[in-house]
Amino acid sequence: MADRNSIGENAAALIGNTPMVYINKLTKGLPGTVAVKIEYMNPAGSVKDRIGAAMLAAAEKDGTVIPGVTTLIEPTSGNTGIALAFVAAAKGYRCIVTMPASMSGERRTLLKAYGSEVVLTDPAKGMKGAIDMANQLKENIPGSIILAQFDNPNNPLVHYQTTGPEIWRQTKGTVDAVVFGVGTGGTITGVGRYLQEQNPGVRVFAVEPEESAILSGRPAGPHKIQGIGAGFAPAVLDTKIYEDVIRIHSDEAIVMAQRLSYEEGLLGGISSGANVAAALQLAARPEMAGKLIVTCLPSCGERYMTSPLYTDIRESAMALAVESLEANLKKLCLHNYDIME
């Protein structure tokens, strides 16, 4: 993983060793303590940088892919596609991403900025629609491959090899519980396995959207928490690794993501809000008194400026206009003071 004290071989060498920080204001008065791993500080901006690089490296090692020859195709809610696009650009691969049209405009723009081609699918079909489209494209494009994040064992493996050890080292082995949103299930599976090998007492909790709580035995449905709640149980997810599932409504995740930015200075995306909301629920339990709960901020809020996360803020920002000093001072509640020209 990334060595921040030397020059990287290429951009992919900068992945990992992301920082951790305590949540302070939002946990005030709660029995437990919460810390977050800031995964949006990976070079392409999300936790998925880890699996994008790992899956491609494994395919290169076994000769499945060749730079400049193989076309990479990947169905994604956005972040894995961006991670693959970033690694593909660094290593010289053509990359095609299929994703539901409901994903944010920033994701489409980022994918194209990295040189990838984007194919949108019916949002009503969720991730299954994107997966079906990717499979159809693979059948028709010679020399193409799907790295298949939902099925690829290198997905949880890289979290077992990197994210888990980083959390253990950064917490000096004092982590008591981890809680992660389930998209592919790679993070919770890999991190959970590693930490429970170090300390079988570490508790693991999953997070899913209230509106699409399939891990809780409910039907799949539309929701706004991009990156989790794929609508099915992925093959790489170890459902025995977690003891319970915490359901977070999209609206709660959005509010928490907003609070994270203006109360903690952490600009996370909607799934970051879901993770922290779940972690705070755990921290509020009496049995969590004095315990350290760890979660992650999977991606940055800048990736969601056109999403429901920032609708009100975006509209307010776009409505700003050039005004006089007096008008600005009145807006800033300084109308009782003399105006100095």
Curated annotation (Swiss-Prot):
Q: Which InterPro entries match?
A: Cys_synth, Cys_Synth/Cystath_Beta-Synth, CysK, P-phosphate_BS, TrpB-like_PALP, TrpB-like_PALP_sf
The protein's annotated pathway? Amino-acid biosynthesis; L-cysteine biosynthesis; L-cysteine from L-serine: step 2/2
Q: Which PROSITE patterns match?
A: CYS_SYNTHASE
Q: In which tissues is it expressed?
A: Expressed in AVM sensory neuron, BDU interneurons, pharyngeal I1 interneurons and M2 motor neurons.
Q: Which GO terms describe its biological process?
A: cysteine biosynthetic process from serine; response to hypoxia
Question: What Gene Ontology cellular component terms go with this record?
Answer: cytoplasm; striated muscle dense body
Tell me the impact of changing S144F: In mr26; susceptible to high levels of hydrogen sulfide
Q: Which cofactors are reported in the record for this sequence? A: pyridoxal 5'-phosphate
List the catalysed reactions: O-acetyl-L-serine + hydrogen sulfide = L-cysteine + acetate
Instruction: Please indicate if the UniProt record lists Disulfide bond as a keyword.
Output: no
Q: Which residues carry this modification: N6-(pyridoxal phosphate)lysine?
A: K48
What are the UniProt keywords, alphabetically?
Answer: Amino-acid biosynthesis, Cysteine biosynthesis, Pyridoxal phosphate, Transferase
Chain sites annotated for binding pyridoxal 5'-phosphate: N79, G183, T184, G185, G186, T187, S271
UniProt-reported outcome of changing A88V: In n5522; severe loss of protein stability
Drop me one GO molecular function for this one: enzyme binding
Record keyword Ribonucleoprotein present: no
- Which Enzyme Commission number(s) are on file for it? 2.5.1.47
Q: How does it assemble?
A: Homodimer. Interacts with egl-9 (via C-terminus); the interaction is enhanced by hydrogen disulfide and activates hif-1-mediated transcription.
Q: Which family does it belong to?
A: Belongs to the cysteine synthase/cystathionine beta-synthase family.
NCBIfam families reported in the protein's UniProt record: cysK (TIGR01139), cysKM (TIGR01136)
Q: Summarize the protein's role.
A: Catalyzes the formation of cysteine and acetate from O-acetylserine and hydrogen sulfide. By metabolizing hydrogen sulfide produced by cysl-2-mediated cyanide assimilation, mediates resistance to P.aeruginosa infection. Mediates survival in high levels of hydrogen sulfide. By sequestering egl-9, which in turn promotes hif-1-mediated transcription, regulates behavioral responses to hypoxia.
Q: What is this protein called?
A: Cysteine synthase 1
Q: Which organism is it from?
A: Caenorhabditis elegans
Q: What is the lineage of its organism?
A: Eukaryota, Metazoa, Ecdysozoa, Nematoda, Chromadorea
